[in-house]
Amino acid sequence: GSEMCIRDSSNDITIVSREDGSGTRGAFVELFGIQQEVDGEKVDMTTVDAQVTNNTSVMLTTVAGDEYAIGYVSLGSLDESVKALKIDGAEATEENIENGSYKVSRPFNIAVKEGADNEVANDFITYIMSTEGQKIVADNGYIPVADTKAYDGTKPSGSAVVGGSSSVSPVMEKLIEAYKSVNPNAK
């Protein structure tokens, strides 16, 4: 069947954005060309009228609570409280992102401090990139990397500090929990 959306044109669309410095915002601004070059610098041209949220959860809650709101989150953060928009007729699905028909996507990167040699951090990265780690990634709605192999880490003792985007926090917490179960020496 066909769907018809009736919008009360007397209500403005509420634009909801992430905070300046957010990786999700940076990717959105870049992917949609919401930046201009000023004096050789790329400048984020997100409207000053946007409601600014400071994490993914607040973005979802804000958009879900306002029928006229529009915002953005990563596919893995998407839940039933909001509806993903089609881009050029393509739905936001893992398959469409992988085949290139849904053109709005970005990779998540793992970064470590240059020159750092933390055995636990290195082993944790090995776990994340393993078949077991990428299964957790996929099970949580994110797109796994291809060509993985079984975890064969060294299981060193010690600790590592993990931080980053709120877009990745839920899956990262599950990866940490799973890693600690295969490497009880890690703190």
Predicted regions: what they are:
Residues 2-3, 7-187:
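Exported/periplasmic ABC-transporter solute-binding proteins
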